[in-house]
């Protein structure tokens, strides 16, 4: 406790957070602007000493030139830049340093006390390092030559290497390292001889020891397969990898290393933000590649299967022009071209085939004399009902074109999706579809077939009116008997009965 020069009537207890050497309780006057000379002197000395942290380790005397020549710090002094700490008083006689973050502060671990410390263990002192044999970087087989005293690198006939302890016991707690190699800033492992580390920015780096001219002997230490054979623990300190002896290693024993608990926690402590950033970066890259493929093949409307389709649970094999959302302009352009080709082909072929169509089809609307109008309409009605009955009896009411078109109503969507197939509503449409010379080369839907047929009918009727000739009424019974759909005996009997009674010519059909 500090002794005040004058007695103070009113005192206030305040915790001093700036001084670590003095007592944690200080006496201040109520008036903050009037402090004694002893307090001012104490604060002045404290400000000069705050933040100075001395790390005591066992070192070897080595010049900076040798550090540069051999590519490793001979002193093995920990990097002070990694110790970004905030002093704070804790209970007990010894003041400990509490870190701001586990990743910003590196601790050493005492195997005897099973406790972490920053500079030295209160019971066993600073950490003990086992130095490598100095070998310049770039020397062939440098990694094997850097083996410390008391150990050796053994190579078998297959070319595999291993490390073994010889001559003397390696005490528990001794530290080997750091692991040397090429540092890569990429957040992935570079190979079998690489170790991952986490930097201050919470990003992964790797130390690759595959190059024997730059690595050291630690690359030959084999990973432990069983817990009982493990005698080394790998841990990270100041963006470097060290091996710590977790028990005494006796002569003739092979060195086996495994990951320490704090090292595994450090690897798993990568922030969720970094993970999301990596995932977002990969997804953007994938979408960019997909868009480039679509631009390279603009005619392919199917395109690649997008991630959004799979996330929504849609089947990639069902084609429902959901791709139209991705290619709206291409879809509209293709549909316009289809209808344009159909219309042009229909108009061009209408004049050439008008006369043939007027003579061959019985479904064209024609103006006939009044006395034949009723008979013609009634016979057409009877013929329609006969066709429906025959189709229901034999199940042949649907005319099909290419194979694979379903007749079930539930598959209507699939029929509309295939532009090369359609379902005709009449034998005339079926004949149009079956004749390859009658159809344009462009594939189209059933409505296009009906449109073409209608255009031909109207054109044929217009040509007949312009010529001033009235079309002769067709002789229905012979034509009906020649139709393939009336090959059924029941249909023949109906028309033969009508002919025998003479009701067709007398206009009494259906009456």
From Swiss-Prot:
Q: Which SUPFAM superfamilies match?
A: SET domain
Sequence position, cross-link Glycyl lysine isopeptide (Lys-Gly) (interchain with G-Cter in SUMO2): 88, 155, 172, 200, 214
The UniProt entry's GO CC annotations, sorted and at most eight, read: cytoplasm; cytosol; nucleus
Question: In its UniProt record, which GO terms are filed under biological process?
Answer: cell fate commitment; methylation; negative regulation of cell growth; negative regulation of DNA-templated transcription; positive regulation of DNA-templated transcription; positive regulation of fibroblast apoptotic process; regulation of cell cycle; regulation of MAPK cascade
Annotated compartments: Nucleus; Cytoplasm
- The broad enzyme category this protein falls into is transferase
Span of the signal peptide: none
Q: In which tissues is it expressed?
A: Highly expressed in lung, including bronchial epithelial cells and airway smooth muscle cells, as well as in peripheral blood mononuclear cells. In tonsils, expressed in B-cell types, including naive B-cells, centroblasts, centrocytes and memory B-cells (at protein level). In benign hyperplastic lymph nodes, expressed in germinal center cells in both the dark and light zones, as well as in scattered cells in the mantle zone and the interfollicular area (at protein level).
Cite the residue spans of the region called Disordered. 389-438
What Enzyme Commission number(s) does the record list for this chain? 2.1.1.-
- InterPro entries in alphabetical order: PRDM11_PR/SET (IPR044405), SET_dom (IPR001214), SET_dom_sf (IPR046341), Zinc_finger (IPR050331)
Q: Please give one Gene Ontology molecular function term for this protein.
A: RNA polymerase II cis-regulatory region sequence-specific DNA binding
Keyword terms of this UniProt record: Cytoplasm, Isopeptide bond, Methyltransferase, Nucleus, Phosphoprotein, S-adenosyl-L-methionine, Transcription, Transcription regulation, Transferase, Ubl conjugation
In the record, the note on similarity to other proteins reads:
Belongs to the class V-like SAM-binding methyltransferase superfamily.
Query: In its UniProt entry, what is this protein called?
Result: PR domain-containing protein 11
Taxonomic source organism: Homo sapiens (Human)
Originating gene: PRDM11
């Amino acid at each position: 406790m500090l002794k005040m020069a004058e007695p103070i009537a009113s005192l206030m207890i305040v915790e001093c957070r700036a001084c670590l050497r003095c007592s944690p309780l200080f006496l201040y006057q109520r008036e903050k602007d009037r402090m004694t000379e002893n307090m001012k002197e104490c604060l002045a000395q404290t400000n000069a000493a705050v933040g100075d942290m001395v790390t005591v380790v066992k070192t070897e005397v080595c010049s900076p030139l040798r550090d540069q020549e051999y590519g490793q710090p001979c002193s093995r002094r920990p990097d002070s830049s990694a110790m970004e700490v905030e002093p704070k008083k804790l209970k007990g006689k010894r003041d400990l340093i509490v870190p701001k973050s586990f990743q910003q502060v590196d601790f050493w671990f005492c195997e005897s006390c099973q406790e972490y410390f920053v500079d030295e263990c209160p019971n066993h002192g600073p950490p003990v390092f086992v130095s490598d044999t100095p070998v310049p970087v770039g020397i062939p087989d440098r990694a094997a030559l850097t083996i410390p005293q008391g150990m050796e690198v053994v190579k078998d006939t297959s070319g595999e290497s291993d490390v073994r302890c010889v001559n003397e016991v390696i005490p528990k707690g001794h530290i080997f390292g750091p692991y040397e190699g090429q540092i890569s800033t990429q957040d992935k492992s570079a190979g079998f001889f690489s170790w991952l580390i986490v930097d201050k920015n919470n990003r992964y780096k790797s130390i690759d020891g595959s190059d024997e001219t730059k690595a050291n002997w630690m690359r030959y230490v084999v990973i432990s397969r069983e817990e009982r054979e493990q005698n080394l623990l790998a841990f990270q300190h100041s963006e470097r990898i060290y091996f710590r002896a977790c028990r005494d290693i006796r002569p003739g024993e092979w060195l086996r290393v495994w990951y320490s608990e704090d090292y595994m926690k450090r690897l798993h402590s990568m922030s969720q933000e970094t993970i999301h950033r990596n995932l977002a970066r990969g997804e953007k890259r994938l979408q960019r590649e997909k868009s480039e493929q679509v631009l390279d093949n603009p005619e392919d409307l199917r395109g690649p299967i997008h991630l959004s389709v799979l996330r929504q649970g849609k089947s990639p094999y069902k084609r429902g022009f959901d791709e139209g959302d991705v290619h709206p302009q291409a879809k509209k352009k293709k549909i316009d071209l289809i209808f344009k080709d159909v219309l042009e082909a229909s108009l061009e072929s209408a004049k050439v085939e008008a006369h043939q169509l007027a003579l061959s089809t019985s479904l064209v609307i024609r103006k006939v004399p009044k006395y034949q109008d009723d008979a013609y309409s009634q016979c057409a009605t009877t013929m329609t009902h006969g066709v429906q009955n025959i189709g229901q009896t034999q199940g042949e009411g649907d005319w099909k074109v290419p194979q694979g078109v379903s007749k079930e109503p539930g598959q209507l969507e699939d029929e509309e999706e295939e532009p090369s197939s359609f379902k005709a509503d009449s034998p005339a449409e079926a004949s149009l579809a079956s004749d390859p010379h009658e159809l344009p080369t462009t594939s189209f839907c059933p409505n296009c077939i009906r449109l073409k047929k209608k255009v031909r009918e109207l054109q044929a009727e217009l040509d007949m009116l312009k010529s001033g000739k009235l079309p002769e009424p067709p002789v229905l019974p012979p034509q009906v008997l020649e139709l393939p759909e009336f090959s059924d005996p029941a249909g023949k009997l109906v028309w033969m009965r009508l002919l025998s009674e003479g009701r067709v010519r007398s206009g009494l059909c259906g009456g």
